[in-house]
Amino acid sequence: VLTKLEVGQRCSEITRSQEIDSGGTALRADLFLAVDVPLPWPKPVFNHQLLMGVEELLSNHSFPLRLVASVPENNNALTLTAYTLNDDSLNRQQWVFNPPDLSSLLERVLEGQTIEGFEEVPQEEQKRELWICTQGSHDVCCGSEGTSLALEASTKFSEVEIRRVSHLGGHRFAPTAITFPERRMWSHLNMEDLQTIFGVSSIDDKLTRKCRGWCGSKTGAEQVAEREGLKIYGRDWDRYVRKSEIISEENSEIRVQVDGIHPESRSQVGFEAVLQEVEKTPVLSCDKAGSIPNKWQTQYEIKKVNVHS
C-alpha cells in the first residue's frame, strides 16, 4: 500500500488503483442540512460570508448532524433543505430564506420548533436525491471528478434531484456522494453505478463494496457489517428500520449484531457479522501531497455472517 502521495498524483486515482475499501467511512448523522450558498466556496466552506456564525451554532447541538453548502439553482431564491429523522422515518422539508435570516431559520430547525415567517416549499412524495461532493477548494478530485459526474447525472436522471455540495469527507474516494432517502454513502461512483442505484436491478457485490456505509450506523465496523444486509436482503434492505451494535471485540476480531424490522409486515430479521481488522491504510489527500499522512483508516474483512432465521 502506498504510504505517501507524490506531488502530481491524485488521491482518488491511487485509492481506486489500490482497491482500498471505503467501507466504514460514511458520516454518522440523523439530521442533514443543505444550505444554498453561491459559488465560489472557500476552504473551509464555513468561512463563506453567508455561513458566518453557523459553525458555532451547530456546535451547540450534540446530536449527530451534517450541514453542507449546496450550489443554488437560483441565487435570488436561496433554500435550506432538511432531512430529519422522526420515529425512524425520514422527513424532507425545504424553506426559502434571505441571507440575513439564515441563522434564525437554522436555529428553529435545530431546536425542532415550528417554522413561521419562512416560505415552505411543497414537497413531492418519495423524492430521490443525490448529493455529490464537488468542492474543488477542498480537494481537486472532488472538484474535477465529482463535478463531472454531477453534471452528467443531471442530464440523465430527470427524476432524481442532483445536488453539488461541499465536503462530505472521503475525497480520496471521489466521486463520493450520499443518496436520499436511503442515507447511504458511496465511493468512486460512475454513471453505471448510478443507473443501478436509482434503477430496479439488484445491487451486486462489486457495487456493495463501493458503499462507504449507512449513516444510521456508527462509522467503522458497524457500517461495514450493516452493508452486508444489501447482499442478504437485496435493495429492500434500505426500507427496513435498522440498528447495529458491536457485541464483542477481542484482539482484532469484532462481532456486530444487525437487526431490521420491515416497515409494512413488521417482520423482524437479523444477522451477526464477524469482522477482522486486517490493516490500516493512509488517508491520502491531494493538498498534502509530498508529506506523510497523519490519519489512517482501518480496513475490515468479513469473516462470516450468521443470519438468524
Residue ranges of predicted features:
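Histidine/cysteine-enriched polar flanking segments
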Residues: 1-309
